[in-house]
Amino acid sequence: MIFHKEGSAYNLGIRLADKINEWLYNYEHPIQVHIGSDGDPFASHVYRHFMEQTPERDNIKYSILTNGLMFKEFYNTVPHVINNLQELGVSIDGASKETYEKLRLGGKWEKIIEGLECISELKKKHDFRFILHFVVQKDNYHEMEKIIDLGEQYGADRVWLNKIEDWGTMDDFRTQDIFKTPEYQHTLAKLVQRIHKRDDRFIECPTLISEAVRYKNKN
């Protein structure tokens, strides 16, 4: 992802964004365009340029994955995307100020809450799917139920909880591997009880369940 506004990488990104928009303008069949997954798109000048210039066409639907911190500041600059938004995902790995600001370096709890409030209001108007994504790890597993509460509070359609994975970017991934500890197992059991009580698909945690099953079968 490109965060600056100069240099060859930025210029190449702008040209590519314009080419994609030109292609979208002439494309007549239904299509969904996903924006994000490699960083926050609202923090990228190239992504923002793409979203600002994208054509308004009924056949184009959009999905966005964002960390939510800059959404309120920039959503009104990309009306064509918001008007045709099908799904908005927010990655948030803490359900309290202390945990959130520990895991999201530079992030402010008050700002993400403002973002969630803004998204909640926009959802009422545009009726897009709103999903929270929560990566479970050592410093936040105790907030698995709290993130469910947060999703309910701000009108999310679903909350995804996924086990942290080792992508080779951590110095010692073993320090994050809390998934066999009694404390984590107890917390997961409470979450599973809550899933059964809801009897719907608001809470999704397939990687957590499969990990627990593997651990149980080994023992």
Model-derived features: positions:
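Short beta-alpha junction loops
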Residues: G68-M70, E165-D166
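Radical SAM enzyme [4Fe-4S]-AdoMet core and its adjacent flexible, acidic
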Residues: I2-D18, R48, I60, P79-N219
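Conserved Radical SAM active-site core
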Residues: I2-S63, L69-H80
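Glycine-centered flexibility sites
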Residues: S37-G39, G68, G94, G106-G107
